[in-house]
């Protein structure tokens, strides 16, 4: 397996959003945070399936494949993001299935058709959803879908929503096993940004679907 610093550099070399849209809260995750999350999650997704909901330019999906996911699927509603993601995967010679579609249309039938003989593998959702700053409750749409299709979920959220997410997931029948705090680096890309760079405190949750038992002790 490659070193985390090497993965960080590889991901940071990839194309960012070519035309980020504020209403979709499109922020490209920096290489360090992406690498940290992927190394945190690798025991879950190694030789299994990764589904990146709202994949943007594909950093999490591509990184997971580099670290040994058997299959990686990226879903995004924005066609420009998907085209950039495909370019990024090609640049690193990584095989990822990218689809331009609404995440609400992703279901077991779709995934079974995409995965074929790999349909019975563990499905790990790794997502960087919108925080809901531009569209209220946008984060809930992603949480609901992740809990529907994923066996294990890694999801990034704005730190002030930590208590809400914990209660929301538990009410939906999910089990939060690990919480990881970090900073999300955001450069000035929209007109309403006043500073060149800000670091937003975020929290990453590892969630198990009710009835799914992990088969290893997380370190």
UniProtKB/Swiss-Prot annotation:
One GO-annotated biological process of the protein: biosynthetic process
CDD domains: AdoMet_MTases (cd02440)
Molecular function GO labels: transferase activity
SUPFAM superfamilies for the chain: S-adenosyl-L-methionine-dependent methyltransferases (SSF53335)
Coiled coil: none
This protein's name: Uncharacterized protein MJ0284
Species of origin: Methanocaldococcus jannaschii (strain ATCC 43067 / DSM 2661 / JAL-1 / JCM 10045 / NBRC 100440)
